């Protein structure tokens, strides 16, 4: 199996992967091993009942990604439900205010072929920035992108 995975990487290895189906647990470990990305983006958070991305999916992506600090980005940042809100402590009683709030992240990927930037929009501005930015640079010797901390 290892030989087949290494041969397949010559044709299918990627630097940045986009996870299929919101990070569900319906995936092939062997396929993830072949992809061997340095970063993976998971689009999730469409107010669905499946708890995507799944914990086993996140673990497997991390385990079979390359680099000491592989990157996993998910558009799902936070959710709150009515069972967690204590409205009796709020002074506002305006019934038109929305009480259940869902916030999703926005992820941008940009590259010129030698550098790549993956930026995730923050929920709140920190200092003067609205983005959490991660940089990848092309390593000529390894012929692959590397995460620059």
Language model features with spans:
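Active-site-proximal loop/helix segments of hydrolase catalytic cores
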Residues: 1-60
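Binuclear metal-ion centers of metallo-dependent hydrolases, dominated by the metallo-beta-lactamase
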Residues: 39, 46-149
């Amino acid at each position: 199996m290892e030989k087949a995975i290494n041969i397949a990487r010559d044709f299918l290895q990627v630097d940045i992967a986009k996870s299929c189906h919101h990070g569900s647990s319906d995936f092939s470990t062997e396929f993830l091993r072949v992809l061997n990305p340095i970063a993976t983006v998971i689009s999730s958070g469409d107010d669905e009942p499946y708890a995507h991305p799944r914990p086993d999916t996140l673990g497997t992506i991390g385990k079979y990604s390359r680099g000491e600090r592989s990157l996993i980005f998910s558009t799902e940042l936070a959710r709150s439900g009515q069972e967690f809100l204590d409205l009796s402590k709020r002074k506002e009683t305006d019934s038109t205010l929305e009480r259940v709030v869902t916030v999703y992240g926005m992820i941008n990927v940009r590259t010129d072929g030698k550098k790549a930037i993956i930026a995730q929009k923050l929920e709140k501005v920190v200092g003067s920035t609205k983005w959490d930015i991660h940089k990848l640079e092309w390593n000529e010797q390894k012929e692959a992108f590397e995460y620059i901390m």
